[in-house]
Amino acid sequence: MLVLAALGCREDAGEPTAPETTAPLAVAAAQALTFSKLSAGGGHTCGVASDLRAYCWGLNFNGQLGDGTTTQRLTPVAVAGTLEFRQVSAGLNYTCGVTTTNRAYCWGQGEAGNLGDGTKMDQSLPVQVAGGHLFRRVDAGDAHTCGVTTSDEAYCWGFNDRGVLGAGIIQRQSTPVAVSGGLKFRQVAAGGTHTCGVTTSDVVYCWGSDSVGQVGDGSNTAGVFVPTRVATSRRFQLVDAGLGAFTCGVTTADKAFCWGSGRNGEIGDGRDFLRFLPRAVTGGHAFDRVTTGGTHTCAVATDNRAYCWGLNAGGALGTGTSVARSLIPVAVAGGRFFSQVSAGKSHTCARSGAALS
């Protein structure tokens, strides 16, 4: 049976007594649910189960669990309604997902327009993103959301500080606007105040705040309002901007690189410096997936072992110790094999079992 494990979780752990945990523990009720995908957010976690329903647990002050209430849940609760999902993304205080019919829905905190329904209101039930676009996947950040359509076009909506929507404008948007440049994207990741994406030709572009180098173009300007190519010739298969001020990605050669704020070791190169250009993660591991949180990073290696690095607040690294931080990748305790790991603001969740399709 697949086990959903939580690291460094409290209310967001989905474990009945909700303690902080420094090593993986099974999420209560997950034994009755087989999850195919999961996403850790600010203080909540969501996943798609084998019945194609979305389930969430954790903090719920803004309705981010989508069950029609604002009551926190210590175990997974089904998102209200009959929608069937192929993917979900937990942001800081809200959640978005794509249904099996490629429609995007969001719920939770929406004062920045990040729910995409044309309002700036919180919603405790899923609301459809306006515009009629067919999305392949969406990604929820601090207060803005981005998605890639079935025709490989990128759209963003919500808070627009420092050009984080990538549309060449400064106003926040409560409905999707096209990312400038006409690029075709495979994937887009919404971060704290920046966004990055991988094109269909395996090139990484970033935009938004570049105050600590998270855009990766070698500068640290206040804001980048249109997609800017990251200064590297390497080809990438995926990128993640997380809920912090740094970015990580995995190349087509299965190597992890990070850039931006590294004050807590989240870059993984053995130093605690800012990095304005991509830096190789130390250790020589071959990675399939990487995920960035608020101040920590985790990744799944090609042998399905999980590693984390950065700040260990609340045990987010899953090492089984209370060490304050790690500047290099450390193995997640317990010897499990993982198919997916998702880093939230200060907690991490992972799915153990066979690789995801």
Where are these regions (language model features)?
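Short coil/turn segments at the loop-to-beta-strand junctions that recur within blades
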Residues: 82-85, 121, 132-135, 171, ...
